[in-house]
Amino acid sequence: MHTTFEKEGIQQSAKDFFESENDNPSASLSLSFCVQTLDGTVILSGILENTPVTLTNIKPWDISEPNLYKIVCTLSENGTAIQTETITTGFRTTRFDTNEGFFLNDAHIKLKGVCQHHDLGALGSAVNRSAIKRQLLILKSMGVNAVRTTHNMPAAMLLELADEMGILIVDEAFDMWEMSKTTYDYARFFKEWSARDVKSWICRDRNHPCVILWSIGNEIYDTHANEHGLEITRYLKEQVLLHDPYGHALPTIGSNFMQGENARKCADILKIAGYNYAERLYNKQHADHPDWVIYGSETSSTVQSRGIYHFPLAKSLLTDNDGQCSSLGNSTVNWGAKNQQFCAVSDLHMPFSLGQFLWSGFDYIGEPTPYQSRNSFFGQIDTAGFPKDAYYFYQSVWTDAKTNPMIHILPYWDFNPGQIIDVRVYTNAPKAALFFNDTLIGEKKLAHTQEDNIIADWSLPYKKGVLTAIAYDEFGNEIARDTKHSFCDASSLRLSADRLEVPANGEELIFVTIDALDADGYPVDNANNRVHVTVEGEGLLAGLDNGDSTDYEPYKGDCRRLFSGKLLAIIAPTLNAGTITVTASSDGLKDAVLTLNTVACKNRDSDDLHIMTITRDPLADAVSHATDIPVRSITLSCEDSCILTANKPSTVISAVTHPANAAAQPLDWKVTNAEGVVVPYATLERIDDTHMHILAFADGSFFVRCSVTNGRGYTVLYSMLEFKAEQIGTMNLDPYSFTVGSLYSDSEGEIANGNAHGAATGSEGTTSITYGPFDFGLFGSDTVTIPIFETESRPVDLTFIEGKTKTQPGTVLCRGHYDKKMIWDTYQEETFKLPKRLTGVTTFTIQVTNRKLHIGGLSFKKLEKAWSPLSVTDIDRVYGDAFCKTDDAITGIGNNVTIEYTDMDFGERTCVVIEITGRSPIEKNTIHVRASNGTNETLNIAEFTYSDDYVTKRFPVNVLSGSQTVTLLFLPGSNFDLKGIRFVKI
């Protein structure tokens, strides 16, 4: 409620809570009320008039003390009760200050929020109170105090729980208005249904003290496209205020178009503006619009897979061969924050901002950027409810070390011997220290308001042992510690539940975590064993979820693989009191058994109870009896040094798979860069199944990767070892093979990770992406094909530059025009004709201004000299007694002139046609056409008759197969002007 507090108590009108309709104006109606605590203690009761009622001894609703009350109102006609309504609500004040941010009950609060989709992982979109509560508890432990319900009206249970748990809510309604985002979305119904839907939405939710803002839309293109968006904004604002006239919450919008004038006009109507991924605009637009309240309605969009680490940390990596995203903190999409540190700290330095809402709290089903997989990677928590490393990062920023000290190490500790591992420590303490086997590695003082000093980072070579991180307070006292042990193969399973006893009401759920331990009892953090789960007694298995976005096995089955060492089993009790026995088993491991209890419900009304319906996915039968033992990890080692030189350019690398009894399968070997893109600096030669010979033939750093599919048909895990080649020499790229977008040699301006190993340009300013150097050869190419993913379905121009380096600006070749309707997350090829052929060794630069584009890569069409039009500039050698060479012709060709074209490869053809474009001022020029490969030759005669202008004439000739030199010989008596030649297949 947006209420007014007074020293004596709280003034509140019944109209704030209820609406009534009087169909009989002549009847004697009265409205009585009773305000009571949740345990039934009456605070005040009486008859309501049209004057405010003052409540005394009321405890306000707050995020730290979410005090709630019941209000019972009874409408009576002539003394007879005809309707009774009961609500649970709370009393609080809110204030949105344009300079100081958000105040709850006059206390400043920075919104530490997340965006949440509606699904519940393995439960899908089915609403369950205990599942939602579990999500909110996990979020609160992270430090979250606010949730944005993206992008639809939330389940009533969510708001009820937010009231009870003290979580602020931005209650959002629409993801589109009249302009659709997909074919069958709500835009089809907006004009007819929006008024009715707003009424039901506001009237249902307006008495929840947790709700502080009504969001009327998310990333609405109508607000950007034209001024009709302003009309809809006014209309929706009016509809909200019509049903919430007392301003219990205020209307707002979440926009990714705030750089545009039209969207700013819409924001000016609302005065509370949510920005999606636009922190760069805050300060200027705060200065330009001092009457606006500003906040980050959607931020972050870093992507991460729990327990997956793509090294090195210094390399920004979006996609990789395993279909996962790195949890090191180096995996970001091009529209989101550059890293977690920026996202967390930038908002802190803008006191006028209400706060921010990370995208997202939990992973959710669908929208799986940057891959076409099962669910998203954006969450700080996976779909199973297991925190990712990013969770602990935000916990380190959003929680207080004095009340909830914490520290967290990443990654797990199981890699190749000697491999350089980036180790990160997150803590909310002012100082952290890292130890390896009790030896101090280093200490770091941290400042949680400084982007570059918020994480403690170290790099060290891997060897077996234990990492320990210790957090210290400002006085040097230890307040928290975390450890990561090296581990061996899984030996047993372990079960743990969020609670061991629940009421037998058919609605409560128990969430059981299954993980694997080695023989010494240490967690096997990369375990992927297949686990079978059975539930006996008064319970049912409602679902299994491991949080793996790439795992398509059914949720509604009885077996799944562990992912990064964990699996969640969701248990649904029946209506009967008793015990539930949960058993987890895996081939070769000790079973784990857990006993749970269900207790009879007191005062149980069977009409109010129902048992959860559990439906088994038919696809689950395909895997229910599987007993495969997958490869957990691959250990790579080099027989001597990983530094290759001109004197020793090769070595042998070996692989050992774990566990030893894993299913036999081929190992896939590649030479790649850090992103997993194949690079041409070295080659691999197979010795046997587990040994490869590597030979380097160019300087540079590269990785040998060894991967397995574990029966899934795609890479599921890999191991890599870094090599450096020195003093061998440099090499140029092949322009006629596809060069992946991320393999650029230089860049200027804003650049980010593109989809599928591409490169993404910035939306503001000019971005230049340089590739090469390429060796185009003597004849070269004048055609380039570029796969492009353009996100707005608007035309865009690209500028192409030759020869740009760090010291040379290069030469502008031309501008290319791209205009194709966007297909989401899909590259579409466009071929561009260049005004000249690129030859020799040079670079190629793509330049884009003020547009976000994904460049998937590029490849050039190799022109076949033998079959291409050859102008006088393509002549390799000309000599003789008389001729005059200009830019476009050789004129006055006279006695004993020889014109040579080298590297003419006709393949297997020996009979062709030569087209000669020239001018013969005499009756006839006899041109001798000779083809020679140094061993054999052919000689042909072309009689070019009189012409007063340039004409093209065709002559059949014999040539040799393969590569050769073609010569035009002009004997004494010749008088000819030549513009060019061309050979044609017959």
Language model features with spans:
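Extracellular ectodomain segments of secreted/surface proteins
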Residues: 1-22, 396-418, 629-646, 771-776, ...
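Extracytoplasmic
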Residues: 431, 532, 585, 605, ...
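Structured loop/turn residues at beta-strand edges in well-structured enzyme cores
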Residues: 64, 109, 142, 209, ...
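Secreted/periplasmic carbohydrate-active enzymes, especially glycoside hydrolases
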Residues: 1-151, 161, 165-166, 197, ...
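Exposed regions on extracellular, virion, or secretory-pathway luminal proteins
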Residues: 11, 361-364, 674-677
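Flexible, low-complexity linkers/stalks enriched in Thr/Pro that connect modular domains
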Residues: 90-92, 398-400, 484-489, 599, ...
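A general structural signal for stabilizing positions within well-ordered secondary structure
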Residues: 60-63, 138, 205, 264, ...
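Extended substrate-binding grooves/exosites of carbohydrate-active enzymes
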Residues: 80-478
